[in-house]
From Swiss-Prot:
Recorded GO MF terms: rRNA binding; structural constituent of ribosome
Name listed for the protein in its UniProt record: Large ribosomal subunit protein uL4
Protein family: Belongs to the universal ribosomal protein uL4 family.
Keywords attached to this entry: Ribonucleoprotein, Ribosomal protein, RNA-binding, rRNA-binding
Lineage: Bacteria, Pseudomonadati, Pseudomonadota, Gammaproteobacteria, Oceanospirillales
Biased segments, Polar residues type: 44-53
Pfam families: Ribosomal_L4 (PF00573)
Role this protein plays: One of the primary rRNA binding proteins, this protein initially binds near the 5'-end of the 23S rRNA. It is important during the early stages of 50S assembly. It makes multiple contacts with different domains of the 23S rRNA in the assembled 50S subunit and ribosome.
Top-level taxon: Bacteria
UniProt keyword Hydrolase, yes or no: no
Organism the protein comes from: Hahella chejuensis (strain KCTC 2396)
GO CC term, one of those recorded: ribosome
Listed InterPro entries: Ribosomal_uL4, Ribosomal_uL4-like, Ribosomal_uL4_dom_sf
């Protein structure tokens, strides 16, 4: 299929139908996005059981003859300073997603972006100096506000010029993910980045 390059007389760029003209599979995209978000969860909650609390190796008093209730350790859950009976453990929230499924979901998302005219292709996206004002002017010319910019390689000037603008993110072609593609109103891709994405997903 052919995608139009934004700009007067820029022409078109040919891309694979496999990566950019696939039917939208909502269930698969939902599964992959959920798995991606789950993988970012920390899951760092932890408490100590009686065996993990420091101390308590010695029996506090002898088993019989003292008249007191029998006790084997001062770290019993019923004692102050003891372990937790049912201690919380760190959780791994990650979900398994096969490479084939992930690739198909990414193809599905990109194809839907093309159908909804949310994918903007440009020859290149670069700024001469790390100036936010210059970069903002470029975005205004293209009529973009909430946008993900995908470049073949993000140089220092582009990164510094864009990092302070709300709702604008910049990434390399190899770093695209399902959540960032969906989250932005528009996705601006350079021709070289488009070819790299096609190579990865085609």
């Amino acid at each position: 299929m052919e995608l139009t390059i934004n700009g007067a007389g820029k022409g078109t760029v040919s891309v694979s139908d496999v990566a950019f003209a696939r039917d939208f599979n909502e269930a698969l995209v939902h599964q992959v996005v959920t798995a991606y978000l789950a993988g970012g969860r920390q899951g760092s909650k932890a408490q100590k059981t009686r065996s993990q609390v420091s101390g308590g190796g010695k029996k506090p008093w002898r088993q019989k003859g003292s008249g007191r209730a029998r006790a084997g350790t001062i770290r019993s859950p019923i004692w102050r300073g003891g372990g937790k009976t049912f201690a919380a453990t760190p959780l791994d929230h990650s979900q398994k997603v096969n490479k084939k499924m992930y690739r198909a979901a990414m193809q599905s998302i990109l194809s839907e972006l093309v159908r909804q005219e949310r994918l903007v292709v440009v020859e290149e996206m670069a700024v001469e100096a790390p100036k936010t004002k210059q970069f903002n002017a470029k975005l205004k010319d293209l009529g973009l506000e909430n946008v993900l910019i995908v470049a073949d390689a993000v140089d220092q000037n582009l990164y510094l010029a864009s990092r302070n603008i709300p709702h604008v993110d910049v990434c390399d072609a190899v770093a695209i993910n399902p959540v960032s593609l969906i989250a932005h109103d528009k996705v601006l891709v350079t021709v070289s980045a488009l070819k790299k994405i096609e190579e990865m997903l085609g």
